[in-house]
């Protein structure tokens, strides 16, 4: 259970083929269904399948993640379990790496961390590292044009505090060197719901400054299908 949709455990649940539900309201619905009405049996005792709360009616509230998908997109999909196979995600901020390590790994993707220190790490050094991960040399763009499976760089964008301007400039330069759109952390939810990791790996648009918005998005169950993340 969760209070938000776009959490590490929530994403992992979707990869694993589980529902995600809002903790308080779903608990209350189960308690109500399990409580006898007067002297008769409880609704669950009367007909478990018919009276068990529909998890899609108890989704956690929406956050600021860029997705407009309806509730049916949250139905467990076993095909998501290997959706990141062939993709390598490079992080340069430790908390982002820790947050997304489990769901990406669960989806058979690779997760790497390369520390970046403001005013110390150079764009050239980072680009060389990313290209080396991709099995390429030099400082130019990806040889495959950032299309299909391959390496994806996850952008770190602190909105305030020391280093915020430095990181913004760093990400722009990396994107331009690689001709590669650096993705935002909150884009993973929509990709997982659509079972399409390819939307996370795209070339930089010519008119872009390095930040490109993602494209618009268009049963019976057992208790083991539910994840209640903390």
Where are these regions (language model features)?
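BRCT (BRCA1 C-terminal) domain core and associated BRCT-interaction motifs
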Residues: 1-57, 95-229
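Short, low-complexity disordered segments enriched in Ser/Pro/Gly and basic
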Residues: 80-86
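Predominantly eukaryotic Lys/Arg-rich, low-complexity intrinsically disordered regions
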Residues: 75-80, 155-156
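Short N-terminal or domain-adjacent regulatory/targeting segments
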Residues: 47-76
């Amino acid at each position: 259970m969760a209070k938000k949709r776009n959490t590490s455990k929530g994403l992992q649940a979707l990869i694993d083929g589980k529902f995600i539900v809002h903790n308080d309201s779903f608990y209350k619905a189960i308690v109500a269904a399990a409580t006898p009405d007067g002297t008769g049996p409880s609704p669950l005792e009367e007909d478990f399948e018919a009276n068990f709360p529909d998890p899609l009616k108890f989704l956690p509230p929406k956050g600021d993640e860029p997705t407009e998908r309806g509730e049916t997109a949250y139905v467990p999909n076993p095909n998501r379990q290997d959706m990141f196979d062939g993709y390598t995600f490079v992080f340069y901020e430790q908390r982002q790496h820790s947050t997304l390590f489990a769901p990406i790994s669960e989806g058979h993707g690779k997760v790497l961390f390369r520390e970046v220190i403001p005013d110390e790490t150079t764009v050239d050094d980072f680009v060389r590292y990313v290209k080396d991960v991709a099995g390429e040399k030099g400082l130019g763009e990806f040889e495959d044009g950032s299309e299909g499976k391959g390496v994806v760089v996850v952008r770190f964008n602190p909105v305030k505090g020391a280093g915020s301007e430095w990181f913004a400039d760093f990400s722009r330069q990396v994107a331009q060197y690689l001709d590669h759109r650096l993705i935002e952390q909150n884009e993973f939810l929509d990709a997982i719901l659509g079972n399409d990791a390819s939307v996370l790996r795209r070339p930089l648009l010519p008119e872009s400054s390095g930040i490109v918005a993602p494209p618009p998005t268009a049963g019976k169950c057992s208790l083991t299908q539910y994840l209640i993340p903390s």
